[in-house]
From Swiss-Prot:
GO terms for biological process: lipid metabolic process; response to reactive oxygen species. The keyword Transport applies. One of its GO terms (molecular function) is pigment binding. Keywords: Disulfide bond, Pigment, Secreted, Transport. It comes from Homarus gammarus. One of its GO terms (cellular component) is cytoplasm. This is Crustacyanin-C1 subunit. Disulfide bonds join C12-C121, C51-C173, C117-C150. Oligomer; Can form dimers (beta-crustacyanin); or complexes of 16 subunits (alpha-crustacyanin). There are five types of subunits: A1, A2, A3, C1 and C2. Found in the carapace. It is found in: Secreted, Extracellular space. Binds the carotenoid astaxanthin (AXT) which provides the blue coloration to the carapace of the lobster. Belongs to the calycin superfamily. Lipocalin family. The lineage of its organism: Eukaryota, Metazoa, Ecdysozoa, Arthropoda, Crustacea.
Length: 181
């Protein structure tokens, strides 16, 4: 058996989850709305390659997510998920998409109206972990000043920002069609 390439030696980054949780909980509903995926690190669970558009609807307790875009095979794809407070009381969110498993998610930094920097990590036995990072934008493009804010947030927890790959967005994307999926 071979260890998947996204499972690497080391531990998850040290994040002050309690501080972030306390700051973000009162503003959680502000996270609702449309977010475009601007960039991400290698993630075998992200089945949508291009034009990634996420709609977050808040019901007072959790977000229902509709993610759409173009899959690796070139076809439109819709995935349904949920984002909710960790059910065991830990100070982070859990993200759970259909045909996957729930994973911890921390919003490292956001202003709720332009950008969000997201980090997910799971520690395994024997000193291994998997971490996945995302940069989201409220529009198909993201101003450099906000990209720099996310880069600084990730560097602050020692995530190598050269791991990020920009997501194709823009005029070649069928956003109007995606909205109807």
């Amino acid at each position: 058996d071979k260890i998947p390439d996204f499972v690497v030696p080391g531990k998850c980054a040290s994040v002050d989850r309690n501080k972030l949780w306390a700051e973000q909980t009162p503003n959680r509903n502000s996270y609702a709305g449309v977010w475009y995926q601007f960039a991400l690190t290698n993630n075998p669970y992200q089945l949508i390659e291009k034009c990634v558009r996420n709609e977050y609807s808040f019901d007072g307790k959790q977000f229902v997510i509709k993610s759409t875009g173009i899959a690796y095979d070139g076809n439109l794809l819709k995935r349904n998920g949920k984002l909710y407070p960790n059910p065991f009381g830990e100070p982070h969110l859990s993200i759970d998409y259909e045909n996957s498993f729930a994973a911890p998610l921390v919003i490292l930094e956001t202003d709720y109206s332009n950008y969000a920097c997201l980090y997910s990590c799971i520690d395994y036995n024997f000193g291994y972990h998997s971490d996945f990072s995302f940069i989201f934008s409220r529009s198909a493009n993201l101003a450099d000043q906000y990209v720099k804010k996310c880069e600084a947030a990730f560097k602050n927890i020692n995530v190598d920002t050269t791991r990020f790959v920009k997501t194709v967005q823009g005029s070649s994307c069928p956003y109007d069609t995606q909205k109807t999926l």
